[in-house]
Amino acid sequence: MTGTPLRVGLVGYGLAGSVFHAPLIAATPGLALDTVVTSNPERQAQARAEHPDVRVAASADELWARADELDLIVVASPNKTHVPLATAALEAGLPVVVDKPVAGTAAQARTLAELAEKRGLLLSVFQNRRWDNDFLTLRRLIADGELGEVYRFESRFERWRPQLKGGWRESGDPAEIGGLLYDLGSHVVDQALVLFGPVTSVYAEADVRREGAQADDDTFLALTHESGVRSHLYVSATTAQLGPRFRVLGSKAGYVKHGLDPQEAALRDGSRPGASGTEWGAEPEELWGRLGAGESPVTGGGAPVPTLPGDYPAYYAAVARALHADGPNPVTALEAAAALDVLEAARRSAAEKVTVTL
């Protein structure tokens, strides 16, 4: 992409801002990280050290005052700030990327989408797990008909973290929009909708298991899709023995994949997309999933399938193209609203111990 890079203002420099958004923006041709907003002095120093040429501001108000100098706002601050910050950016005439979940409710997400449409501005949601290596591989296998007619999709995002970390993500205050249902659940629900389409019913169990915990830390969702596929989704911080990331069953074959996409770990370790001598998002052969059918107690049947490289950089590359009217919005707010419909139904299902029809 040629021409002057689009100038990006990034709000938030915690995990999402510093580990995911800032490195990916910096690695994207056509984008330039202009300003980082954080009120935390330690994070301000971190931002200056990691991005010496970038301005650091203490308040998002400094971005709105310079709206004519910026081309895109990225909201990577705590969940409860997503809606007010995205609204302020759109009202300032600036396109916006918002980290997931875009809002606490589907109604809020649709209101944001309406505002963006009214202003003629891009509003995109950062659902980076659409570019996980295992998810890209599974999409290809389904598209190629390798599994036949899929009837069951099992997706697990499990961790063993018996000790609480504290912070807003583990708060029991509904205003914080914390808990695993809205954190990791945003990913697994989005992936299920991308693969198998709209949902007609939701059953969920949401438990608080760790001592001192306030927010859900062990959650299960059972979705029935209009297509007939049933999705069983697990998100947990209390799993002492991890299950497969994916187990997908079809009329011809099944696909089982263990382990997590390597990109988050690489970003946390300081690796960057495009660095020489590395193949971004690749994993070793011993981690490949298996495709096929059988009853082997050791392998389950089938044979290893090469995992496609993960590609988080593809998200911001698509955003840059969309801002130049050269491609679609990679993740729309209305898509995110559909996922929030499911998450809200799951929360109600777990609270009332009922199956919720959508």
PLM-predicted stretches and their roles:
Residues 17, 58, 75, 98, ...:
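Hydrophobic residues in well-ordered beta-strands that form the structural core
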Residues 28, 252-330, 334:
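C-terminal glycine/acidic-rich active-site capping loop/insertion
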Residues 54-115:
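Beta-loop-alpha module in the N-terminal Rossmann-like domain of NAD(P)-dependent dehydrogenases
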Residues 111-128, 149-153:
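Rossmann-fold dehydrogenase core element
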Residues 1-51:
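N-terminal Rossmann-like dinucleotide-binding module
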Residues 1-5, 62, 72-74, 304, ...:
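C-terminal helix-rich "cap/oligomerization" subdomain common to oxidoreductases
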Residues 129-212, 353:
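Predominantly a Rossmann-like dinucleotide-binding segment in NAD(P)-dependent oxidoreductases
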Residues 190-273, 313-325:
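Contiguous beta-strand/loop segments that form the cofactor/metal-binding neighborhood of enzyme cores
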